[in-house]
Amino acid sequence: MALPVEEWRRSAARCWAALEPALRERLAAAPLGEALRMGCGLFGPEEAALQRLCRRARTGKEPAAARFYREEGNRQFGRCCYRDAVRLYSQAAAHEPPRSPEVALCFANRSAALFHLGHFEVCLEDIARAESHGYPDRLLPKVLLRKAECLLRLGRLQDATDTLTAVENKMAVDGIMTSPIHRMLLKKLSQLKTEIHEGSCPEPAREADGDVQRESEIWEENGSISGASSSLSLNFSTERGRHLVASQDILPGQNLLKEKAFVSVLCPGEGDSLLLQDSSETVWDTRVTNADLYCHHCLKQLLASIPCCGCSYAKYCSQNCADVAWEQYHRTECPLGALLLTLGVFFHVALRTVLLAGFSEVSRLVEWSRDDSNKDLCNAEAGGEHPSEALDTRAGRKVIPGCNDNGQYQSSYQAVFNLLPHVEKHSPEHKFLCMLSIVAICKKLQETGLEAAVLNGESSTTGSEQKTCGKTSDELSPELMIMAEAMLRHVLQLQCNAQAITVMQELESGDGAVVNKKPVRLATAFFPVLSLLNHSCSPNISVSFSGTAATVRASQPIPSGQEIFHCYGEEMLCCSSEACAFSVSRERLSQRLLDLQQQMEKALELLRDSKADEAIKMLLKCQIDARNFLSPEHLLMGELEDHLAQVYATLGKWQEAARHLGRSIQLVEMHHGPSSVEMGHELFKLAQILFNGFAVSEALSTIQRAEEILSVHCGPQSTQIQELQEMKTCLLELPRSILQRT
């Protein structure tokens, strides 16, 4: 959810409509700072409505929720659903107070589930966490035995021996134990000692490395654009604004840019399950969202999360990420969690941007932008009457907006600040909504006593110990007004400059013989250098992500002098490319299309419930319905073929699956092109089907095509390329007689 919840948007719209026409005109024409000053007085009557909406977004630590998730975790553990148990114990830990026996119990329970999943190193980390948070002394022998078994599985015999000695000493100090549980512990202790003595431990287990992409390509970095290849140059014109062009011929697959986001904020997920409907009955949600799956700081996929000490929302992959996030921004965001979820990701990004930049830098640039002598420099890209290059009168030379004093364009706050907000292109009503929302954030900072921390960057206590010694006032302090002006600028910038960080996420389906993945929006970010690329629905580059870092590669040959184009998504910008030259009104078909999509989703639910035959019947009916109002070339027709292929693959009917996927591939090629990343993902699925169906020659040729395409878009070290190479190796190792037959 990029923008606020619908109820707040409606509330702001009613407030705007009720204003006197003259005041609306003044607000519409006012500079950002002046609009905010007027908005402070208008926010008061709307504050209660926003507070009521914020109560639906539950981000505090609630003991009742902790009990619920822990009991659900125990239930899943009893069913041997260890992965679900890990997730539920993590949610329970997020609701427990830090350094308490209750949170220690969550970590200990989670360590047991991790042990059964074979994640022995992570299991050891959870055992250490349980001990450090005050795990009950009487229960310690059980987790110490688990620790010894992990060490044994990892081949660390001496450490395992030392741990068993500690267990023996502990049990001896506690005296004679005759209960069934104690007898079981003694039996386990004896068994582990025997295994160590006989040296019968298995080969040391290797933990999965995860989706780590290793870059081996050597390239020459650009001296003027941080993170960019020397094959690019930065140009400027009134028509195109700042843009990147090829300074030499570029080949497909060539790396053009490697940039870490200046700021990124995790998107909660498609379901927005943290935003509950008004209800007197408390219902805890067990659905999985991005907030449960990825680190809120580095965006690494989570296995055993570290919860924030102050809220139940933020989760991290390591204590280091938790500490860095706290020091840089989360100590301020933590008490504002419900408000930020209610207002949406764009406002969260705006706040985090100014927190990372710091008041000193924000103040410098806001004051600079207010200076009349710099208005041409700030607005040089707006088009019209401004010269093709802006003149920095202080330096006496022409510069491109966003560059530093040395003429370098860096991935810095100055570059972020100089991205165009396109104030004149936003409707007055939308600007009013954004202004009210920014005022709400700053008022909350003022009321909760966080203003000093925001302005001075001073360290503060943990979230559970935050002091609410703030003040209430209809006006913001001059310093907060500066921060508010910058935040409002950033929210308006995001409409055209936000970059979605996406990941390929596996979909739940069938027996796992064929891995079905789809791109999922993981986070919203500012990439100052990547934002130099103008939009086109026919881009000539592909962007892939690893954590918060973006890698840009050429997706086709780019001759010297040609502009580099990126597709930001159809909701962002108007586009003059050939792909967008014609638009068809779908208003009359929208409801029918929505009904069809809902039926397709029901079919996939049947597949997830192992009702493949029923899923096929429903999908075939969807096909008949679709043919009545969609063209044969519509992308949804391809999705139907893709889903049918998925169901037949689950049933092991590989030829049928390949036939349906082949039809899907034809439509993907028609819409996205034969060398598109979408084509690469479809060929990857076809390769899996042909591999499982033992169609060796077809599988090998499909693997080669998929490799050629995906290596261009994702790099030669991506996970999918490695899986394709493993399939190829397996097929080539088959006996020659089998290869000749197939």
Swiss-Prot record:
Binding site for Zn(2+) 2: C308, C311, H330, C334
Enzyme Commission number(s) of this protein: 2.1.1.-
Residues at which S-adenosyl-L-methionine binds: R110, S111, A112, N418, N534, H535, Y568
Sequence ranges assigned to domain SET in this UniProt record: 230-569
One Gene Ontology term from the biological process aspect of the record: heart development
Top-tier EC class: transferase
Catalytic activity: L-lysyl-[protein] + S-adenosyl-L-methionine = N(6)-methyl-L-lysyl-[protein] + S-adenosyl-L-homocysteine + H(+)
Any one annotated GO CC term: nucleus
Entry keyword annotation includes Methyltransferase: yes
GO terms assigned for molecular function: histone deacetylase binding; methyltransferase activity; zinc ion binding
Pfam family, one: zf-MYND
Keyword terms of this UniProt record: Cytoplasm, Metal-binding, Methyltransferase, Nucleus, S-adenosyl-L-methionine, Transferase, Zinc, Zinc-finger
Predominant location: nucleus
Superkingdom classification of source: Eukaryota
InterPro entries: SET-MYND_domain_protein (IPR052097), SET_dom (IPR001214), SET_dom_sf (IPR046341), SMYD4_SET (IPR044421), TPR-like_helical_dom_sf (IPR011990), Znf_MYND (IPR002893)
Compartments in which it is found: Nucleus; Cytoplasm
Listed PROSITE patterns: SET, ZF_MYND_1, ZF_MYND_2
Function: Protein-lysine N-methyltransferase. Monomethylates PRMT5, modulating its transcriptional activity. May also act as a histone methyltransferase. Plays a critical role in cardiac development. Acts as a key epigenetic regulator of gene expression during cardiac development via its dual activities as a methyltransferase and negative regulator of HDAC1.
UniProt similarity note: Belongs to the class V-like SAM-binding methyltransferase superfamily.
Protein name per UniProt: Protein-lysine N-methyltransferase SMYD4
The species this protein was found in: Gallus gallus (Chicken)
